[in-house]
Amino acid sequence: MAIPITVLDCDLLLYGRGHRTLDRFKLDDVTDEYLMSMYGFPRQFIYYLVELLGASLSRPTQRSRAISPETQILAALGFYTSGSFQTRMGDAIGISQASMSRCVANVTEALVERASQFIHFPADEASVQALKDEFYGLAGIPGVIGVVDCMHVAIKAPNAEDLSYVNRKGLHSLNCLMVCDIRGALMTVETSWPGSLQDCVVLQQSSLSSQFEAGMHKESWLLGDSSFFLRTWLMTPLHIPETPAEYRYNMAHSATHSVIEKTFRTLCSRFRCLDGSKGALQYSPEKSSHIILACCVLHNISLEHGMDVWSSPVTGPVEQPPEEEYEHMESLDLEADRIRQELMLTHFS
Protein backbone atom coordinates (compact mmCIF):
# COMPACT_ATOMS: atom_id res chain seq x y z
CA MET A 1 0.00 0.00 0.00
CA ALA A 2 1.30 3.43 -0.87
CA ILE A 3 2.45 5.51 2.09
CA PRO A 4 0.84 8.97 2.13
CA ILE A 5 3.31 11.79 1.72
CA THR A 6 2.98 15.29 3.10
CA VAL A 7 5.06 18.17 1.80
CA LEU A 8 5.31 21.12 4.15
CA ASP A 9 5.17 24.63 2.76
CA CYS A 10 8.66 25.81 3.68
CA ASP A 11 7.81 29.31 2.51
CA LEU A 12 4.99 29.48 5.05
CA LEU A 13 7.28 28.18 7.80
CA LEU A 14 9.86 30.83 6.94
CA TYR A 15 7.62 33.80 6.35
CA GLY A 16 4.49 33.05 8.38
CA ARG A 17 0.96 34.02 7.48
CA GLY A 18 2.05 37.19 5.73
CA HIS A 19 3.58 35.16 2.90
CA ARG A 20 1.48 34.10 -0.09
CA THR A 21 0.26 30.63 0.82
CA LEU A 22 -0.91 27.75 -1.29
CA ASP A 23 -4.51 27.94 -0.13
CA ARG A 24 -4.87 31.12 -2.16
CA PHE A 25 -4.36 29.35 -5.47
CA LYS A 26 -7.54 27.71 -6.69
CA LEU A 27 -8.10 26.01 -10.01
CA ASP A 28 -11.48 27.67 -10.31
CA ASP A 29 -9.86 31.11 -10.14
CA VAL A 30 -7.89 30.73 -13.39
CA THR A 31 -8.91 30.21 -17.00
CA ASP A 32 -8.60 27.01 -19.02
CA GLU A 33 -6.16 28.82 -21.30
CA TYR A 34 -3.94 29.65 -18.34
CA LEU A 35 -3.89 26.03 -17.15
CA MET A 36 -2.99 24.76 -20.61
CA SER A 37 -0.24 27.34 -21.11
CA MET A 38 1.33 26.88 -17.67
CA TYR A 39 0.74 23.19 -16.95
CA GLY A 40 -0.08 21.60 -20.30
CA PHE A 41 -3.35 19.96 -19.28
CA PRO A 42 -7.02 20.97 -19.03
CA ARG A 43 -8.91 21.53 -15.79
CA GLN A 44 -10.85 18.25 -15.72
CA PHE A 45 -7.69 16.24 -16.32
CA ILE A 46 -6.01 17.96 -13.37
CA TYR A 47 -9.06 17.26 -11.19
CA TYR A 48 -8.81 13.59 -12.18
CA LEU A 49 -5.15 13.49 -11.12
CA VAL A 50 -6.05 15.04 -7.77
CA GLU A 51 -8.62 12.28 -7.25
CA LEU A 52 -6.21 9.58 -8.42
CA LEU A 53 -3.14 10.69 -6.46
CA GLY A 54 -4.61 12.67 -3.58
CA ALA A 55 -4.41 9.88 -1.01
CA SER A 56 -0.71 9.34 -1.74
CA LEU A 57 0.12 13.02 -1.51
CA SER A 58 -1.55 13.95 1.78
CA ARG A 59 -2.09 12.65 5.27
CA PRO A 60 -5.52 11.44 6.40
CA THR A 61 -5.81 14.52 8.63
CA GLN A 62 -5.34 17.93 7.06
CA ARG A 63 -2.54 20.17 8.25
CA SER A 64 -2.62 23.87 7.52
CA ARG A 65 1.06 23.93 6.69
CA ALA A 66 1.00 21.06 4.21
CA ILE A 67 1.10 21.72 0.48
CA SER A 68 -2.14 20.44 -0.99
CA PRO A 69 -2.19 17.53 -3.47
CA GLU A 70 -3.65 19.92 -6.04
CA THR A 71 -0.67 22.26 -5.77
CA GLN A 72 1.85 19.41 -5.73
CA ILE A 73 0.34 18.08 -8.96
CA LEU A 74 0.45 21.51 -10.61
CA ALA A 75 4.10 21.90 -9.62
CA ALA A 76 4.96 18.51 -11.12
CA LEU A 77 3.00 19.12 -14.32
CA GLY A 78 4.73 22.46 -14.68
CA PHE A 79 8.13 20.79 -14.51
CA TYR A 80 7.25 17.85 -16.76
CA THR A 81 5.88 20.10 -19.49
CA SER A 82 8.43 22.93 -19.27
CA GLY A 83 11.58 21.03 -18.36
CA SER A 84 12.74 23.50 -15.71
CA PHE A 85 12.00 24.82 -12.23
CA GLN A 86 11.20 28.33 -13.37
CA THR A 87 10.75 31.01 -10.74
CA ARG A 88 7.54 32.16 -12.40
CA MET A 89 6.14 28.64 -12.12
CA GLY A 90 6.67 28.55 -8.38
CA ASP A 91 5.43 32.11 -7.97
CA ALA A 92 2.22 31.21 -9.79
CA ILE A 93 1.28 28.70 -7.11
CA GLY A 94 3.09 30.37 -4.22
CA ILE A 95 5.98 28.00 -3.53
CA SER A 96 9.76 28.14 -3.78
CA GLN A 97 11.84 26.16 -6.25
CA ALA A 98 12.95 23.89 -3.39
CA SER A 99 9.33 23.10 -2.58
CA MET A 100 8.64 22.53 -6.27
CA SER A 101 11.45 19.98 -6.39
CA ARG A 102 9.96 18.03 -3.50
CA CYS A 103 6.52 18.18 -5.10
CA VAL A 104 7.90 16.78 -8.35
CA ALA A 105 9.58 13.93 -6.46
CA ASN A 106 6.39 12.99 -4.62
CA VAL A 107 4.08 13.19 -7.63
CA THR A 108 6.59 11.22 -9.69
CA GLU A 109 6.64 8.38 -7.18
CA ALA A 110 2.85 8.39 -6.92
CA LEU A 111 2.56 8.03 -10.71
CA VAL A 112 5.25 5.33 -10.86
CA GLU A 113 3.34 3.31 -8.25
CA ARG A 114 0.38 3.29 -10.64
CA ALA A 115 2.32 2.55 -13.83
CA SER A 116 1.02 -1.01 -14.19
CA GLN A 117 -2.55 0.30 -13.96
CA PHE A 118 -2.11 2.37 -17.12
CA ILE A 119 0.77 0.73 -19.05
CA HIS A 120 0.12 -2.87 -20.07
CA PHE A 121 -0.74 -5.18 -22.94
CA PRO A 122 -4.43 -6.02 -23.34
CA ALA A 123 -5.37 -9.07 -21.31
CA ASP A 124 -8.38 -10.44 -23.19
CA GLU A 125 -8.41 -12.10 -26.61
CA ALA A 126 -10.93 -9.66 -28.07
CA SER A 127 -8.69 -6.68 -27.31
CA VAL A 128 -5.63 -8.46 -28.70
CA GLN A 129 -7.48 -9.27 -31.91
CA ALA A 130 -8.64 -5.65 -32.14
CA LEU A 131 -4.98 -4.58 -31.96
CA LYS A 132 -4.08 -6.94 -34.79
CA ASP A 133 -6.97 -5.72 -36.91
CA GLU A 134 -5.98 -2.07 -36.40
CA PHE A 135 -2.36 -2.67 -37.36
CA TYR A 136 -3.39 -4.78 -40.34
CA GLY A 137 -5.64 -1.98 -41.51
CA LEU A 138 -2.74 0.47 -41.36
CA ALA A 139 -0.33 -1.23 -43.78
CA GLY A 140 -1.37 -4.85 -44.27
CA ILE A 141 0.97 -6.69 -41.90
CA PRO A 142 -0.99 -9.36 -39.97
CA GLY A 143 -0.46 -10.50 -36.39
CA VAL A 144 1.11 -7.27 -35.11
CA ILE A 145 0.20 -6.27 -31.55
CA GLY A 146 2.74 -3.48 -31.06
CA VAL A 147 5.73 -1.54 -32.34
CA VAL A 148 8.96 -1.49 -30.33
CA ASP A 149 11.84 0.96 -30.28
CA CYS A 150 14.25 2.72 -27.92
CA MET A 151 14.51 6.41 -27.05
CA HIS A 152 17.47 8.10 -25.36
CA VAL A 153 16.85 10.71 -22.66
CA ALA A 154 19.80 12.84 -21.55
CA ILE A 155 20.76 12.79 -17.86
CA LYS A 156 23.54 14.39 -15.85
CA ALA A 157 26.72 12.36 -15.42
CA PRO A 158 26.26 10.06 -12.38
CA ASN A 159 29.99 10.29 -11.59
CA ALA A 160 33.29 10.60 -13.40
CA GLU A 161 34.11 6.89 -13.17
CA ASP A 162 30.81 5.44 -14.38
CA LEU A 163 30.88 5.25 -18.18
CA SER A 164 27.93 2.88 -18.50
CA TYR A 165 25.57 5.78 -19.21
CA VAL A 166 27.72 7.32 -21.96
CA ASN A 167 26.19 6.65 -25.38
CA ARG A 168 27.99 6.57 -28.72
CA LYS A 169 27.75 10.35 -29.05
CA GLY A 170 29.59 10.83 -25.76
CA LEU A 171 26.46 12.00 -23.91
CA HIS A 172 25.08 10.55 -20.70
CA SER A 173 21.64 9.08 -21.23
CA LEU A 174 19.09 6.44 -20.36
CA ASN A 175 18.06 4.12 -23.17
CA CYS A 176 14.32 3.63 -22.78
CA LEU A 177 12.57 0.64 -24.35
CA MET A 178 8.92 1.17 -25.28
CA VAL A 179 6.12 -0.58 -27.15
CA CYS A 180 3.05 1.29 -28.39
CA ASP A 181 -0.21 0.48 -30.12
CA ILE A 182 -1.59 2.17 -33.23
CA ARG A 183 -2.98 5.11 -31.17
CA GLY A 184 0.37 5.73 -29.51
CA ALA A 185 -0.70 4.22 -26.18
CA LEU A 186 2.30 2.68 -24.42
CA MET A 187 2.03 -1.00 -23.51
CA THR A 188 5.58 -1.55 -22.28
CA VAL A 189 7.98 1.01 -20.82
CA GLU A 190 11.42 0.19 -19.41
CA THR A 191 13.33 3.36 -18.55
CA SER A 192 16.34 2.32 -16.48
CA TRP A 193 18.73 0.96 -19.13
CA PRO A 194 22.14 2.73 -19.34
CA GLY A 195 22.77 4.74 -22.49
CA SER A 196 25.86 2.74 -23.45
CA LEU A 197 23.74 -0.33 -24.23
CA GLN A 198 22.70 -0.88 -27.83
CA ASP A 199 19.00 -1.27 -28.54
CA CYS A 200 19.38 -4.97 -29.35
CA VAL A 201 21.08 -5.61 -25.99
CA VAL A 202 18.41 -3.69 -24.10
CA LEU A 203 15.69 -5.76 -25.76
CA GLN A 204 17.54 -9.02 -25.22
CA GLN A 205 17.87 -8.34 -21.48
CA SER A 206 14.40 -6.85 -21.04
CA SER A 207 11.35 -8.31 -19.33
CA LEU A 208 9.56 -7.73 -22.64
CA SER A 209 11.81 -10.25 -24.37
CA SER A 210 11.31 -12.72 -21.52
CA GLN A 211 7.53 -12.48 -21.94
CA PHE A 212 7.62 -13.24 -25.65
CA GLU A 213 10.26 -15.97 -25.32
CA ALA A 214 8.07 -17.62 -22.68
CA GLY A 215 5.15 -17.67 -25.10
CA MET A 216 2.97 -15.16 -23.28
CA HIS A 217 1.87 -13.56 -26.57
CA LYS A 218 1.40 -16.54 -28.88
CA GLU A 219 0.59 -16.10 -32.56
CA SER A 220 1.49 -12.42 -32.28
CA TRP A 221 4.55 -10.34 -32.99
CA LEU A 222 6.07 -6.94 -32.60
CA LEU A 223 7.63 -4.79 -35.29
CA GLY A 224 11.08 -3.34 -34.70
CA ASP A 225 13.63 -1.52 -36.83
CA SER A 226 16.99 -2.83 -38.04
CA SER A 227 18.68 -2.09 -34.71
CA PHE A 228 17.08 -5.32 -33.43
CA PHE A 229 17.65 -8.96 -34.33
CA LEU A 230 14.89 -10.75 -36.22
CA ARG A 231 12.99 -13.11 -33.92
CA THR A 232 9.99 -15.38 -34.30
CA TRP A 233 8.05 -12.74 -32.34
CA LEU A 234 9.82 -9.65 -33.74
CA MET A 235 9.64 -8.76 -37.42
CA THR A 236 12.35 -6.43 -38.74
CA PRO A 237 12.87 -4.95 -42.23
CA LEU A 238 15.11 -6.58 -44.81
CA HIS A 239 18.51 -4.96 -45.12
CA ILE A 240 18.66 -5.21 -48.92
CA PRO A 241 15.25 -5.96 -50.46
CA GLU A 242 15.46 -7.51 -53.91
CA THR A 243 12.03 -8.75 -55.00
CA PRO A 244 8.83 -6.69 -55.37
CA ALA A 245 7.37 -8.57 -52.41
CA GLU A 246 10.36 -7.63 -50.26
CA TYR A 247 10.07 -3.98 -51.24
CA ARG A 248 6.36 -3.97 -50.44
CA TYR A 249 7.02 -5.63 -47.09
CA ASN A 250 9.66 -3.04 -46.20
CA MET A 251 7.34 -0.20 -47.16
CA ALA A 252 4.54 -1.64 -45.02
CA HIS A 253 6.99 -2.17 -42.17
CA SER A 254 8.18 1.44 -42.37
CA ALA A 255 4.62 2.78 -42.39
CA THR A 256 3.74 0.72 -39.33
CA HIS A 257 6.95 1.48 -37.45
CA SER A 258 6.35 5.21 -37.91
CA VAL A 259 3.67 4.97 -35.21
CA ILE A 260 6.25 4.71 -32.43
CA GLU A 261 8.46 7.38 -34.00
CA LYS A 262 5.46 9.70 -33.89
CA THR A 263 4.77 8.64 -30.31
CA PHE A 264 8.33 9.52 -29.27
CA ARG A 265 8.02 12.95 -30.89
CA THR A 266 4.74 13.46 -29.05
CA LEU A 267 6.24 12.51 -25.69
CA CYS A 268 9.11 14.93 -26.15
CA SER A 269 6.97 17.79 -27.39
CA ARG A 270 4.44 17.47 -24.55
CA PHE A 271 6.95 16.66 -21.79
CA ARG A 272 9.84 19.03 -22.41
CA CYS A 273 11.81 17.61 -19.49
CA LEU A 274 12.56 14.66 -21.83
CA ASP A 275 13.69 16.45 -24.98
CA GLY A 276 16.95 18.00 -23.77
CA SER A 277 15.99 21.53 -24.83
CA LYS A 278 16.40 22.75 -21.23
CA GLY A 279 19.39 20.51 -20.61
CA ALA A 280 19.74 17.00 -19.26
CA LEU A 281 17.66 15.73 -16.36
CA GLN A 282 19.57 16.83 -13.25
CA TYR A 283 18.90 13.69 -11.25
CA SER A 284 20.41 10.31 -10.53
CA PRO A 285 19.73 7.59 -13.12
CA GLU A 286 17.11 6.04 -10.82
CA LYS A 287 15.20 9.28 -10.25
CA SER A 288 15.51 10.21 -13.93
CA SER A 289 14.07 6.84 -14.96
CA HIS A 290 11.12 7.43 -12.63
CA ILE A 291 10.46 10.87 -14.13
CA ILE A 292 10.43 9.37 -17.63
CA LEU A 293 8.05 6.63 -16.51
CA ALA A 294 5.79 9.18 -14.81
CA CYS A 295 5.54 11.13 -18.08
CA CYS A 296 4.63 7.91 -19.90
CA VAL A 297 1.87 7.23 -17.38
CA LEU A 298 0.49 10.74 -17.95
CA HIS A 299 0.67 10.18 -21.70
CA ASN A 300 -1.50 7.06 -21.43
CA ILE A 301 -3.94 8.70 -19.02
CA SER A 302 -4.29 11.53 -21.54
CA LEU A 303 -5.31 9.03 -24.20
CA GLU A 304 -7.78 7.34 -21.86
CA HIS A 305 -9.39 10.73 -21.30
CA GLY A 306 -9.79 11.35 -25.00
CA MET A 307 -7.07 13.97 -25.34
CA ASP A 308 -5.65 14.19 -28.86
CA VAL A 309 -2.02 14.00 -27.79
CA TRP A 310 -0.71 13.78 -31.36
CA SER A 311 -2.05 17.19 -32.25
CA SER A 312 -0.59 18.91 -29.19
CA PRO A 313 1.26 22.06 -30.25
CA VAL A 314 5.05 22.08 -30.06
CA THR A 315 6.15 25.23 -28.25
CA GLY A 316 9.78 25.09 -29.27
CA PRO A 317 12.43 22.96 -30.94
CA VAL A 318 12.31 19.31 -29.98
CA GLU A 319 15.93 18.34 -29.45
CA GLN A 320 16.17 14.61 -28.85
CA PRO A 321 19.50 13.34 -27.57
CA PRO A 322 21.39 12.01 -30.60
CA GLU A 323 20.20 8.60 -31.67
CA GLU A 324 22.57 5.69 -31.80
CA GLU A 325 23.85 4.63 -35.20
CA TYR A 326 23.73 0.90 -35.76
CA GLU A 327 24.69 -1.49 -38.46
CA HIS A 328 21.90 -3.73 -39.69
CA MET A 329 21.44 -6.68 -37.35
CA GLU A 330 21.65 -9.93 -39.32
CA SER A 331 19.31 -12.66 -38.23
CA LEU A 332 20.71 -15.70 -36.45
CA ASP A 333 17.27 -17.32 -36.15
CA LEU A 334 16.41 -19.62 -39.06
CA GLU A 335 12.84 -20.11 -37.88
CA ALA A 336 12.37 -16.33 -37.73
CA ASP A 337 13.72 -16.07 -41.28
CA ARG A 338 11.24 -18.70 -42.42
CA ILE A 339 8.33 -16.88 -40.78
CA ARG A 340 9.27 -13.58 -42.40
CA GLN A 341 9.65 -15.19 -45.82
CA GLU A 342 6.25 -16.85 -45.46
CA LEU A 343 4.76 -13.52 -44.38
CA MET A 344 6.10 -11.78 -47.48
CA LEU A 345 4.98 -14.54 -49.84
CA THR A 346 1.49 -14.73 -48.37
CA HIS A 347 0.70 -11.03 -47.95
CA PHE A 348 3.04 -9.05 -50.22
CA SER A 349 3.51 -11.14 -53.38
UniProtKB/Swiss-Prot annotation:
One of its GO terms (molecular function) is metal ion binding. It is found in: Nucleus; Cytoplasm. Residues 148-300 form the DDE Tnp4 domain. GO terms for cellular component: centriolar satellite; cytosol; nucleus; plasma membrane. Detected in brain. Its EC number is 3.1.-.-. A divalent metal cation binds at D149, D199, D225, E261. Its cofactor is a divalent metal cation. Keywords: Cytoplasm, Hydrolase, Metal-binding, Nuclease, Nucleus. Belongs to the HARBI1 family. Interacts with NAIF1. Transposase-derived protein that may have nuclease activity (Potential). Does not have transposase activity. This is Putative nuclease HARBI1. It comes from Bos taurus. The gene is HARBI1.
